[in-house]
């Protein structure tokens, strides 16, 4: 993932991770486009290069980008239910006006409230960028 801070052009490729969630402030819509990709190291370089796809998105003031590992969306509660992508998107919408640090803390709080005391066995990692 590369963000040109002069033009606010975001470029990303998938190499085994989840597609970023982008909240567009002016339209209040979520953009999350799956693109072709494969985890790094699974195939040789020529095959990897032929599979990988790059996506460019023009961001504007107030737009929010959230990347995350599947440990967030696959977090399980005591009923063996996953928190899920829709819940993550709703949490982003709910906390979208927060500064980035609080946004991440509040999403984490939503996930932990859902799972309760159930041990999790996957990492839960997030990164958020808000365009000024």
Model regions: which residues?
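Conserved subregion of the PPM/PP2C metallophosphatase catalytic domain
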Residues: 1-132
């Amino acid at each position: 993932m590369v963000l040109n801070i002069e033009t606010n052009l975001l470029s990303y490729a998938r190499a085994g991770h989840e597609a970023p969630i982008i909240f567009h402030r002016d339209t209040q819509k979520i953009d999350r486009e799956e693109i072709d990709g494969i985890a790094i190291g699974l195939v040789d370089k020529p095959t990897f290069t032929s599979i990988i796809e790059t996506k460019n998105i023009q961001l504007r003031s107030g737009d929010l980008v959230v990347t995350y590992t599947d440990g967030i969306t696959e977090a399980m509660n005591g009923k063996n239910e996953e928190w899920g992508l829709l819940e993550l998107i709703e949490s982003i919408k709910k906390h979208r006006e927060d500064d980035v640090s609080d946004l991440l803390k509040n999403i984490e709080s939503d996930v932990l409230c859902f799972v309760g005391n159930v041990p999790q066995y996957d990492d839960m990692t997030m990164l958020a960028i808000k365009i000024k």
